[in-house]
UniProtKB/Swiss-Prot annotation:
HAMAP family xrefs: Ribosomal_uL13
Protein role: This protein is one of the early assembly proteins of the 50S ribosomal subunit, although it is not seen to bind rRNA by itself. It is important during the early stages of 50S assembly.
Keyword terms of this UniProt record: Ribonucleoprotein, Ribosomal protein
Name the UniProt record assigns to this protein: Large ribosomal subunit protein uL13
Annotated GO CC locations: cytosolic large ribosomal subunit
Gene Ontology molecular-function annotations: mRNA binding; structural constituent of ribosome
Region ranges (Disordered): 134-153
Record's keyword annotation contains Signal: no
GO biological process: negative regulation of translation; translation
Summary of subunit composition and partner proteins: Part of the 50S ribosomal subunit.
Amino acid sequence: MKTTSLKPADVDKKWVVIDAEGLVVGRLASIVAMRLRGKHKPAYTPHVDCGDHVIVINADKVKFTGRKYDQKVYYHHTGYPGGIKERSAKFILEGRFPERVVEKAVERMLPRGPLFRQILGHLRVYKGAAHPHEAQQPQALDVGSLNRKNVSA
């Protein structure tokens, strides 16, 4: 039996839309990261971008388990000495760009490198239910029905 190795020209990329309303952030992010890399396909090749385009809508309505909504802290550095800044998940989700919570969760589940930057370009996250990708005819993926723990009670 021969091992198949995909060429970039042979990859069939689909468009998938996921409604994040009521879903647990980490579980959603792991499924999205798997789809972006293409690990759900039988002909997965690690050095080829063989994943799908993923659209996440209602990113502002994701859930955290436990007390992470209040206690989880996101750090960034300004570049100046002593310039470490922190924000809570609650502050970000109630702020201007709540989709960044999902973007960061997915980004941190992907391996770094040139392929990482290419793969991350196939992720689109929107805070509302509307998205401008209807022309691509994305297929809906119900993440909540895959496992009962994916949905926060």
